[in-house]
Amino acid sequence: MSDATVERDAALFAPLARTGPGFYWTVAVLGLMILWGAVAYWTQFDQGLGVTGLQQPVSWGFYVTNFVFFIGISHAGTLISAILRLSKAEWRRPITRMAEVITVMVLFIGAGQILVDLGRPDRLMNVILYGRYQSPLLWDATSISAYLTASTLYLYLPLIPDIAILRDHLGKRRFLYSVLALGWTGTEHQQKVLNRAIAIMAVLVIPIAVSVHTVVSFVFSMTIQPMWHSSIFGPYFVAGAIFSGIAALIVAMAIIRRIYHLEAYLKPVHFRYLGYLLLVMTLLWFYLTFAEYLTGYYGNEPEEMKVFWAKFTGPFWPLFWAMVFCNLVLPMILLVRLQHHAIGKTVIASASVVVGMWLERFNIIVPTLSNPRLPFPEGHYWPTWVEWGETAGSFGLFILFYVLFVKLFPIISIWEIREGREAGLREVEERLRTYLPDGPYPAPGHEGAKAAT
C-alpha cells in the first residue's frame, strides 16, 4: 500500500499511534470492575456457592443468564458479517471487523460464565472425559468450542493484510506484526488464496453459529420444566441472538465513531441499514414471543399457567413488562421512520434492546425455576453482591478486551476500504460506458480517479 493511501486513511491509524488520557482512565475504570469481579469470584471459590442467591429450587440465576446473553451477542459478528460478505453488501466494509471482534471476545466471556457457575471448576474436564454424549451440556461444550475456533480464524484471515500494513508503516510493535503477518506481501496469488479462504469460512460459520444457540436452547427445552419444554425454543433463541447481536454492534459502532472521530467511515447510512435490520428482528422477536406465550396460555396446564401469571402479573411482572418495552415498544417508536436522526434513533433503540434481551434471558430462566413442576416450595431468588460483582467483572473484561484490540489493530479494515473504493470506481466506469460515448475514463488508482473520491 502506498504512502499516499496510508495518509488518506490516517484516521484509522490514529488509535494505534496515539494514546490519550481517556484511554488510561477507561482502562482504570474497567480494571476496578474486573477487580470487583475477581474479589467476588475468590469469595465464592473460597466459601462456596452459599455466598450467592442460588438455592433450591432456583439453582440458575445471573451466571446462566449472562451465559445465554453473551453467547447470543456473539451472533453480532460472525453470523452477520458472513451473511453480509456472501451477499456482497458493499456497505458492510467499515463494520465487519467490529462485529467479528465482538464475537470472539464475548465467546470467551460467555464460556467463562459456566466456570463461574460451577461449584467445583476443577472438575470441568469431567464434562469432556466422562460426559454422556446424549446430554445437551456436552453438545453445548462441543458447539461453543467449534464456534470459537471458527470465529477466531474468521477474524484473523481478513486481518492479515492490515497487519502487514502496520508492519510496513508503523514503527511500534513491528516484531509482533511481522510474526502475525505470516509473510504477507500482497501478491496476486496471496490475495486469491485469502479471498477463497474468507469465502469458505463465511459459508462454514453460518451453520455453526445457528447450531450454537440452537444447542443452548436444548439445555432448557429438553427438560419438562414449565415454559421450557417447547419446540419453538431453537428458532426463538437464534432469532433473539441475532436481535441482540445487531443491537450490540450498533452500540459499539456509535461509541467507536464518537471516540475516534470516524464519521467519514461510519456514516448515517450504516446506522440506517442496521436500523432496518433491527426493526425486522424486533417484529420477528415479537412474533415468536407472542406465539410461545399464546400457545402456553391456550394449553392452560396448571404448572405452565403458574409461571405464565408469575411473569404477567406476579412477582416478575416489572421485569417482564420492562423486557417488552425495551424489545418492542421503544424500538418500534424509534425505528419506524429513520429518514432523520438515524444515528441517534438506532443507538437509543439498540441500547434498549441490549438491556431488554438480558431481561428476556432472566425471564426465561428464573421464573420457571421459582415455580417448579416438582412439589418444591415456591422459590425466591435475589442476587448477592457476589453475583453483581461477577457480572460487572464480566462486562468490564469484555470491554477491556475490545479496547485493547482497538489499540493494537485497525478496528476498520483498511484493505477492504481501499478495495471498496476501487470496486466503486470500476462500477461507475462500466455504467458510464453503457450510455455515454467512449472516452478516456480514469482507471482506479489514476490521479483523476483519486480526485473523484
Predicted features by range, described:
Residues 59-122:
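Membrane helical hairpin/interfacial module
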Residues 97-109, 199-208, 272-283, 349-360:
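Transmembrane alpha-helical segments of multi-pass membrane proteins
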Residues 2-5, 327-330, 341-453:
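TerminUS-proximal long segments
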Residues 42-43, 47, 114-127, 156, ...:
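Transmembrane alpha-helix boundary signature
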Residues 1-76, 402-403, 432-439, 452-453:
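N-terminal signal-anchor module of multipass membrane proteins
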Residues 76-87, 149-164, 248-258, 328-344, ...:
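Transmembrane alpha-helical segments in integral membrane proteins
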